[in-house]
């Protein structure tokens, strides 16, 4: 049976991290973390908006994706982050996967030098070593994709991130994954409307899964396929979700995007 895209990405990532661990010492990462004064509480920023009955947008920064190909040819992550900041987004999500999304961890470091917004390291976490690695570059949050990890690895990633005072975002696409994610009490849970195995998007995924998660203690997020302000408001009005992770729809129309007006 042919590998799906998620399996291909994870296979490549495992190889990369194994090689990186041979040349990068954990002590070095911890030194960088201790020197870095840029950290911001990702979850707290979103929770404050919820408490104040405000919507939150986690705006994504990426050059490319397997589904869309090259999104931005002349890619300047810091410039994009600055535009987002001017439009008062709540947090940033920065793609750092190198082979399929053409990202890099250094993009987080460069953005953090200029802009004071919490940043999610959007990547495929396959080893707990990646958690201090992300934090050493200035990341405030990590992603656990339930479709791409074992139960043991999910637990390890969660515990490592909590130990390092990072926000954990757990991504789900099915009811079964949503049920599994509920045990991560302090995590934010994001419903991904895109099936990472087929890359097909259906915004109804959020409605289908929401009921399973509505009693979760942390904030809920919807991501993928949200193209208009009207779609965002429909999701907000019909569910308890008040936080939205949006990438391509913003990146393709950065200057005058009506989605920013919900903030």
PLM features: what roles do these ranges have?
Residues 133-153, 190-199, 239-260:
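Glycine-rich phosphate-binding active-site loops on the catalytic face of alpha/beta enzymes
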Residues 126-138, 173-185, 216-246, 258-262:
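Catalytic cores of alpha/beta
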Residues 1-62, 67:
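N-terminal amphipathic alpha-helix/helix-capping segment at the start of soluble metabolic enzymes
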Residues 13, 203-213, 250-263:
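C-terminal helical cap(s) of enzyme catalytic domains, especially alpha/beta-barrels
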Residues 57-61, 92-94, 119-122, 142-144, ...:
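Hydrophobic faces of well-ordered beta-strands that scaffold small-molecule active sites
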């Amino acid at each position: 049976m042919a590998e799906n895209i998620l399996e291909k990405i994870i296979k490549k990532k495992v190889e990369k991290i194994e090689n990186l661990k041979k040349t990068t010492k954990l002590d070095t990462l911890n030194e960088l973390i201790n020197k870095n004064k840029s950290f911001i509480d990702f979850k707290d920023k979103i929770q404050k908006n919820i408490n104040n009955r405000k919507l939150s947008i986690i705006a994504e920064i990426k050059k490319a994706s397997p589904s869309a190909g090259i999104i931005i040819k002349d890619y300047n992550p810091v410039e994009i982050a600055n535009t987002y900041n001017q439009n008062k987004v709540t947090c940033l999500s920065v793609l750092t996967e190198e082979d399929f999304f053409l990202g890099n961890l250094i993009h987080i470091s460069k953005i953090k030098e200029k802009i004071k917004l919490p940043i999610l390291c959007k990547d495929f976490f396959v080893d707990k070593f990646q958690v201090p690695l992300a934090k050493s570059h200035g990341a405030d949050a990590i992603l656990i994709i339930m479709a791409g990890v074992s139960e043991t690895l999910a637990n390890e990633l969660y515990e490592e991130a909590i130990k390092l005072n990072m926000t954990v975002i757990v991504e789900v696409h099915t009811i079964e994954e949503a049920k599994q994610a509920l045990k991560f009490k302090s995590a934010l849970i994001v419903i991904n409307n895109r099936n990472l195995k087929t890359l097909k998007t259906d915004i109804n995924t959020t409605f289908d899964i929401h009921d399973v998660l509505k009693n979760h203690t942390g904030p809920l997020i919807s991501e993928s396929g949200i193209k208009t302000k009207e779609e965002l408001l429909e999701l907000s009005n019909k569910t308890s979700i008040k936080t939205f992770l949006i990438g391509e729809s913003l990146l393709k129309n950065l200057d005058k995007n009506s989605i920013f007006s919900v903030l």
